[in-house]
């Protein structure tokens, strides 16, 4: 490999940290300033530049320049400032870069761009993108349901890139072993189709047999090329997400973050709340506000946990209610998704069914103790709704977890104030600490970043053949043991600043459960050791 190729390869490049011996051996003499820096000095210099950027969007652009030139330095810096950088590198700032991707495009970032019109190119595309790297983890999106901002076509590749950044920063998954993938199946966003600078296919989305055939071919090819692959589905539309997951979850090690990941972290937050009150999950009434992939997935996860705690499936479903655009879901509605149908009620059981299009009326009628918002409908959790929740139970669980910030159902501060500090709160974006009547309430972030990195690390370390419900349950339980139930105002989820420790605990729980179920192919029998041995550190 030639000198300039090394300097242009982000997996190999050290920049000014190449030693004199390395510069001599690699033909780099005279191509770098004479001073040899440590990674600490490089990070100090880079962070100083970062602080000069006036907006989060410009800060993200700067950090992506580092990412594109030196992965090790990028992750060293990210680990050092993980709480500060997370909302810049990922949600919410990434939404702005996705919306402007075609106009800001500079570097493909070793992503694989799959074109639904050319299935014959899948093999070549994946091999070209991977090069000589052994890929263990793929995050793939078709970008139909990005981060509450909708359909962004090829531009959604940034969500795959961003997700993998969190995998590495939080759990130490080797960045050379990951591959971001986007399936360009078209887009229904008119502004993209009419933009001559849009870099994706200028066609409306393709659905049905052609779409599923392409996905099948992608999965088969990826599994063939990368035999130890863990496949993560991200931000697929509600019409396809559950179908795809159900097609593959009993065949390969795979995971859908929107359907499963959010459910795990919300369940962990519920466990954290119930640890404080001493109540049982099977005594709760759950209201899902927003019946898309995330909302239905969370409800499904909590339902599965109720069943594991002793209820029959039918008994457990009686504890659940779901509201979507048409109001409370009834089984006579024609447009229910497969994921929504189990939660739909019989209209005849509710004499005021016609009034069940309003959240407040539903809360007063079905008397939930848990309210989770995934609607992206800002302001939906009004003061009256919060007060009605408090009338149902002494300490309600209220999680407005829609993101980005402008899509939240309410703010944590409003929930604390309107509930007089009684409600347990977690939000989908960082909310910090809220002082109310002398108590500092630390607001947990129901951020999937607490769960999916560790889950992935556990899957890779154990070389698990499948991701089972039991392994997912183990991940959720591992979260709940990390909060302090005796501290007033304590968060119901561990703060993101501890995500590295959280990820190790989640990984160990998942790997050990896989081992118990006889699903591991790793030669290592000590799963805690397997997890620690696999963890990658950003060092030269």
Curated annotation (Swiss-Prot):
Keyword Translocase part of the UniProt annotation: no
GO terms for MF: carboxy-lyase activity; malic enzyme activity; malolactic enzyme activity; manganese ion binding; NAD binding; oxidoreductase activity, acting on the CH-OH group of donors, NAD or NADP as acceptor
Enzyme class: lyase
Positions of Mn(2+) binding: 234-235, 258
Catalytic function, reaction form: (S)-malate + H(+) = (S)-lactate + CO2
Needed cofactors: Mn(2+); NAD(+)
Annotated catalytic residues: 90, 163
InterPro entries referenced in this protein's UniProt entry, alphabetically: Aminoacid_DH-like_N_sf (IPR046346), Malic_enzyme_CS (IPR015884), Malic_N_dom (IPR012301), Malic_N_dom_sf (IPR037062), Malic_NAD-bd (IPR012302), Malic_OxRdtase (IPR001891), Malolactic_enz (IPR048182), NAD(P)-bd_dom_sf (IPR036291)
Residues noted as binding NAD(+) in the record, renumbered to the chain: 291-294, 403, 448
Alphabetical list of Pfam families matching this protein: malic (PF00390), Malic_M (PF03949)
Oxidoreductase in keyword set: no
UniProt-listed Enzyme Commission number(s): 4.1.1.101
GO biological process terms on file: malate metabolic process; malolactic fermentation
Keywords for the protein's UniProt record, in alphabetical order: Lyase, Manganese, Metal-binding, NAD
Gene Ontology, cellular component aspect: cytosol
Superkingdom assignment: Bacteria
Subunit-structure text: Homodimer.
PANTHER family found in the cross-reference section: MALIC ENZYME-RELATED (PTHR23406), NAD-DEPENDENT MALIC ENZYME, MITOCHONDRIAL (PTHR23406:SF34)
Known role: Involved in the malolactic fermentation (MLF) of wine, which results in a natural decrease in acidity and favorable changes in wine flavors. Catalyzes the decarboxylation of L-malate to L-lactate.
Family: Belongs to the malic enzymes family.
Protein name per its UniProtKB record: Malolactic enzyme
Source species: Lactococcus lactis subsp. lactis (strain IL1403) (Streptococcus lactis)
Top-level taxonomy: Bacteria, Bacillati, Bacillota, Bacilli, Lactobacillales
